Amino acid sequence: MGKRIVILGGGESGVGAAILAKQKGYEVFVSDESSLKDNYRSDLQNAGIEFEEGRQNETRILNAEEVMKSPGIPEKNEMVKKIRAKGIEIISEIELAYRFKGDSKIVAITGSNGKTTTTALMYHICRKAGLDCALVGNIGYSFARQIAENPKPLYIAEISSFQLDDIKTFKPDIAILTNITEDHLDRYDYNFENYIRSKFRIAENQQPGDHFIYCADDEITMKYINRYNIHSNQLPISMKTELSNGAFIKDGDMYVRTGEDFTSMSVYDFALKGKHNQYNTMAACVAGSTMDIRKEKIREAVQDFQGLEHRMEPVATIRGVEFINDSKATNVNSTWYALESMTKPTILILGGVDKGNDYSLIEELVKEKVKAIICLGADNRKIHEAFGNIVNTIVNTDNALDAVQASFHFSTKGDVVLLSPACASFDLFKNYEDRGNQFKKAVKEL
């Protein structure tokens, strides 16, 4: 038999890794302390992979030569501590996938905000250019499973900090770091520098022929960039500074320069609206340019890209009140971007599982734009403390229907109801998609 690998966690990442490892001759065992979803259970059964659920066989796990840890499992998990203590190597799913990617190219996108939109736009640009590629990682299929079942010459991967935590050799040909803001601090011992280090790992194995695209206007990125030894070709993007390389926006026009290549287009032609999306669009355009995709194709893709569900998604306008679903806003910075783009009086639906939020970041915008806050969470004390003196109306709700009805009650014609929770969703919902879908359903029932 091949190398003994244990896969911790039987979700999308874990099952994808198990299928790839089995295909490549590993002796595979999947362990999940919760129960598996039916589709993942049958995937493992069909592939002839041994697994356990609802319990953990410590002896068998600690007999592994290598462990693949799913990104949702924190370091403070008891079993993870035991694996570390025994000195067994822990890798992430993207590390396993990378071993078997062959000659394929990887464009990897990470960042606290904007990574999903940038990844989806990048994929759209590549498809528009006729490239045979797959969307993998946090969005779409697990990277490992894609390689096992339908390998492609190009992968566009959305990568979280959790996936970067356990890489060893993973190296994207093009890495994009959209920005770094305080997020997931609960997973990084409430130490922001640990989280920052994780994000920069996207570039740590890159070589001079690779490209690293980052935001030169992002304070944290710029403060830390020189602490990490980045060998790749650096391509910054900015709205504040004219750059000789990378991309910048000036007087409503975007200019992209990568080596000899030069492109410009009006930001008014961007399908994605809002300042934050101008950064996302610049990053994807720079990446496309380094891949020698024709300017016309990049321009076309940027103009006809459809936005993503749960990201500033218009739901309906009812009696002159506009409803927007931004359920993907799981941190304060995302909500800052959403509020920043509001031009009408706003009823803000806020709350959920707080990941160490600093609400002072949105205090000024709330003062300026928000007429009422509807809390949608099991524990809303921090929201009341942060905004009790600023907003006259703050109401607690514990389900999407009540939140929507309350927001409609406090709204008048010409207002916007914005679901942009700044928190994770798992106190009351399965995930942010479930929260967004329940919000949309409640709006349709008004």
Residue map of PLM features:
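Beta-strand->loop->alpha-helix junctions that form or flank phosphate-binding loops
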Residues: 52-55, 93-96, 228-249, 301-303, ...
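Phosphate-binding loop of NTP-binding sites
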Residues: 4, 22-23, 58-62, 71-216, ...
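Residue-level signal for inorganic ion chemistry
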Residues: 21, 67, 109, 138, ...
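Short internal beta-strands
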Residues: 27-33, 212-216, 349-350, 369-378
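Residues in the short beta-alpha loop(s) of Rossmann-like NAD(P)-binding domains
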Residues: 11, 34, 139, 217-218, ...
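Nucleotide phosphate-binding/pyrophosphate-handling subdomain across enzymes
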Residues: 4, 14-24, 264-371
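C-terminal helical cap/extension that packs against the catalytic core
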Residues: 41-42, 360-415
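N-terminal leader/targeting and accessory segments in enzymes
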Residues: 1-92, 96, 385
